[in-house]
Amino acid sequence: GTGKTETTLQLARKTGRDVFTIDVSKIKSKWVGESEKAVKGIFKIYRDLCKKKEKMPILFFNEADAVFGKRMENVESSAAQMLNTLQNILLQELESIEGILICTTNLHQNLDPAFERRFIYKVELDKPGEEVRSKIWASMMKGYTQEEYASLGRKYPFSGGQIENVVRKSAVDYI
């Protein structure tokens, strides 16, 4: 809703880079050893892409807290053990990555400190201010006056994603 994914895509566009997006939900498998293979496979594919491309692509983990979250101590369940093993593999891969890694999350407080240390830059995107919200309303809904867009920006402290959802819903309701 605040533009994390869009910022990544615009950064890639502006720098002429491809984005290798990881669907975090597809990493976790109920089958023993499959998640670990998936993670190792992701980094192998990314390393191969880096060798083939003129410009290094961006490795993009959206909603990264699902796999970069705080590790558990004294784990007894097989699911928790699998997640800890998965996280250890991720930590090893991140130690040696030669590329551009971007991770997004709405829950930065849930990230494991070992992962956080490996992120050189941390950028927090807040909800847009009143003026930017007015511009977002204007870009998504045509036919209103500047004063009306300003009023919407003032009245509704929404994120860009929330504004987009309101506009979509109103379009569907109109139909």
Label each residue range with its predicted role.
Residues 1-154:
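Walker A/P-loop NTP-binding motif of AAA+ ATPase domains
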Residues 123, 144-175:
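Conserved AAA+ ATPase small/helical "lid" subdomain
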